[in-house]
C-alpha cells in the first residue's frame, strides 16, 4: 500500500493543502512522486495533451488502463488516481463497476468520476465494494457540449444549486474528495465550507482544500494553456533547443563525439576478424 491513501487525503481537509498533478507515463510519474505530490492523477485529459484529440470524449478504457499501468509502476508514495473516461460508466452502474475494477487492477488506488448527483448510486456501490471514488463537478469536460463549451461555472442561481447538490450527493455517497473545475471562487468557497470532504480546485480560486493542474500546462509544453493554469517552466523552448542542437550536430558531424562510441583497441585483431568474416560471407 502506498503512503498516501484516500483516508489520509480526507484527514488533510482544513489542515494541509492537497497537491495533485497529472502524469501519463512512467518518467513523469517518477518525477511527480519524487516531488512529493499527494495525488498523481491519470486524467482523461491525456486525450488532448498526449493524443492531440480536440476533447476528452474519444478517450477509451484501453488507453486509460495502458497509462494507469505505466504510472502505477512508478509511484511508490502518492495516491494513484485514474479517470473514468466518457462512456465507461454512463450506460449502467454495472458497467461502471466493471470498468472501475479494471483501473484498480491496472494499479489505481482510486477512480475519479465526472458528475455528482446523477452518478450517486454508482459512487455508493463502488465505495461499498472497496473502490475509493473522487467526484468532479463544476465544469465537467466530458459534458462540455451540454454546457455550451468550456466556460466558467457558478454564475447563476441554477448553476450554484447544481454544483452544491452534486457536492452534497457525492459526500453522502461516500466519495473521499471532489474536484471543482473552473468554478467561481465564491462558489468553490461555499462548497468547501458545506462539505466534510476535501475539495480540489482547478481554476476555482484559493478557498479550496487543494489544487490540481495538468503536467503539460505546468511545464509549458504547448503554446497555449487554459487561462487558470500557471506556467512554472517553458520546457517547450528548452526541448526545442535541445533536439535542434542534436539535429545540427548530426548534420555537421559533431555527434557522436569520441566519448560517445568505442573502437577495437587492437586494430590488427579487428583486421583479422574482418578478413575472416568477409571470407565466410564471400564478400
UniProtKB/Swiss-Prot annotation:
Pathway: Cofactor biosynthesis; coenzyme A biosynthesis. It is found in: Cytoplasm. Mg(2+) binds at residues 44, 83, 114. It catalyses: 3-methyl-2-oxobutanoate + (6R)-5,10-methylene-5,6,7,8-tetrahydrofolate + H2O = 2-dehydropantoate + (6S)-5,6,7,8-tetrahydrofolate. InterPro entries: Pantoate_hydroxy_MeTrfase, Pyrv/PenolPyrv_kinase-like_dom, Pyrv_kinase-like_dom_sf. Binds 1 Mg(2+) ion per subunit. 3-methyl-2-oxobutanoate binds at residues 44-45, 83, 112. The active site is at 181 (proton acceptor). GO terms for molecular function: 3-methyl-2-oxobutanoate hydroxymethyltransferase activity; magnesium ion binding. Its EC number is 2.1.2.11. Keywords: Coenzyme A biosynthesis, Cytoplasm, Magnesium, Metal-binding, Transferase. Pfam families: Pantoate_transf. CDD domains: KPHMT-like. One of its GO terms (biological process) is coenzyme A biosynthetic process. One of its GO terms (cellular component) is cytoplasm. Belongs to the PanB family. Catalyzes the reversible reaction in which hydroxymethyl group from 5,10-methylenetetrahydrofolate is transferred onto alpha-ketoisovalerate to form ketopantoate. PANTHER family: 3-METHYL-2-OXOBUTANOATE HYDROXYMETHYLTRANSFERASE. This is 3-methyl-2-oxobutanoate hydroxymethyltransferase. The gene is panB.
Amino acid at each position: 500500500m502506498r503512503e498516501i491513501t484516500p483516508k489520509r487525503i480526507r484527514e488533510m481537509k482544513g489542515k494541509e493543502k492537497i497537491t495533485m498533478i497529472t502524469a501519463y507515463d512512467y518518467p513523469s510519474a517518477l518525477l511527480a512522486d519524487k516531488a512529493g505530490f499527494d495525488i498523481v492523477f491519470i486524467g482523461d485529459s491525456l486525450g488532448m495533451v498526449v493524443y492531440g484529440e480536440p476533447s476528452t470524449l474519444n478517450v477509451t478504457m484501453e488507453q486509460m488502463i495502458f497509462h494507469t499501468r505505466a504510472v502505477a509502476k512508478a509511484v511508490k508514495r502518492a495516491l494513484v488516481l485514474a479517470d473514468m473516461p466518457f462512456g465507461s460508466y454512463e450506460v449502467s452502474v454495472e458497467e461502471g463497476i466493471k470498468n472501475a475494477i479494471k483501473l484498480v487492477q491496472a494499479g489505481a488506488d482510486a477512480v475519479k468520476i465526472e458528475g455528482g448527483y446523477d452518478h450517486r448510486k454508482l459512487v455508493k456501490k463502488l465505495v461499498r465494494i472497496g473502490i475509493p471514488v473522487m467526484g468532479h463537478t463544476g465544469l465537467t469536460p466530458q459534458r462540455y457540449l451540454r454546457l455550451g463549451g468550456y466556460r466558467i461555472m457558478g454564475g447563476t442561481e441554477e448553476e450554484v444549486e447544481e454544483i452544491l447538490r452534486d457536492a452534497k450527493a457525492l459526500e453522502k455517497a461516500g466519495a473521499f474528495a471532489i474536484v471543482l473545475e473552473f468554478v467561481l471562487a465564491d462558489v468553490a468557497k461555499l462548497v468547501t465550507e458545506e462539505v466534510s470532504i476535501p475539495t480540489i480546485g482547478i481554476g476555482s480560486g484559493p478557498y479550496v482544500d487543494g489544487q490540481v493542474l495538468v503536467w503539460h500546462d505546468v511545464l509549458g509544453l504547448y503554446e497555449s494553456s487554459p487561462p487558470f493554469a500557471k506556467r512554472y517552466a517553458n520546457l517547450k523552448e528548452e526541448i526545442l533547443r535541445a533536439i535542434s542542437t542534436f539535429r545540427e550536430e548530426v548534420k555537421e558531424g559533431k555527434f557522436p563525439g569520441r566519448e560517445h562510441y568505442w573502437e577495437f583497441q587492437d586494430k590488427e585483431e579487428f583486421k583479422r576478424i574482418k578478413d575472416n568474416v568477409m571470407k565466410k560471407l564471400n564478400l
